[in-house]
């Protein structure tokens, strides 16, 4: 019962305000330093709170890239059964483009996450771009001069 009474005092208008002002988390000095974008003294030294927005937070390019990755993934979910049910050159070339884009973006994230340094990431990205271009060219060549991706997979299943 005593706990409920203390909670009632804390949750009332003056009790909650007094609790917040006495708290180590929120103090008027911290609030004013936050509003002025000044460094404040923290537990482990000086902390600097930035009020300026990130240059990339409002970027439409990141949102568009994320959306296009999801569109290609959903497109692949539809193209794979379409290639099985109706193997034709349109589906073959669509699969070549979608598979190449999907693998390029996925491997690009691996390069971003695991390749560090000044020149090594640039070389890895250039190598990835060359690999993706060769993959697309190879799949298009296979579609044009041979049976195509869909029929090749069907022939492999018959083995």
UniProtKB/Swiss-Prot annotation:
- Membrane association type: Multi-pass membrane protein
Per UniProt, a ubiquinone binds at 114
Function, as annotated, reads:
Membrane-anchoring subunit of succinate dehydrogenase (SDH) that is involved in complex II of the mitochondrial electron transport chain and is responsible for transferring electrons from succinate to ubiquinone (coenzyme Q). SDH also oxidizes malate to the non-canonical enol form of oxaloacetate, enol-oxaloacetate. Enol-oxaloacetate, which is a potent inhibitor of the succinate dehydrogenase activity, is further isomerized into keto-oxaloacetate.
Alphabetical UniProt keywords: Electron transport, Heme, Iron, Membrane, Metal-binding, Mitochondrion, Mitochondrion inner membrane, Transit peptide, Transmembrane, Transmembrane helix, Transport, Tricarboxylic acid cycle
Named in its record, the pathway it takes part in is:
Carbohydrate metabolism; tricarboxylic acid cycle
Mitochondrial matrix compartment ranges equal 57-63, 112-120
- Pfam families membership: CybS
What gene is it encoded by? Answer: Sdhd
Q: Which residues lie on this side of the membrane: Mitochondrial intermembrane?
A: 86-90, 143-159
One GO cellular component this record assigns the protein to is:
mitochondrial inner membrane
Membrane-spanning ranges:
64-85, 91-111, 121-142
Question: In which organism is this protein found?
Answer: Mus musculus (Mouse)
Q: What residues does heme b bind to?
A: 102
Name listed for the protein in its UniProt record? Succinate dehydrogenase [ubiquinone] cytochrome b small subunit, mitochondrial
Q: How does it assemble?
A: Component of complex II composed of four subunits: the flavoprotein (FP) SDHA, iron-sulfur protein (IP) SDHB, and a cytochrome b560 composed of SDHC and SDHD.
Swiss-Prot/TrEMBL GO biological process terms:
cellular response to hypoxia; mitochondrial electron transport, succinate to ubiquinone; proton motive force-driven mitochondrial ATP synthesis; regulation of catecholamine secretion; tricarboxylic acid cycle
Q: Which GO terms describe its molecular function?
A: heme binding; metal ion binding; succinate dehydrogenase (quinone) activity; ubiquinone binding
Q: Where in the cell is it found?
A: Mitochondrion inner membrane
Record: transit peptide: 1-56
The family note in this entry says: Belongs to the CybS family.
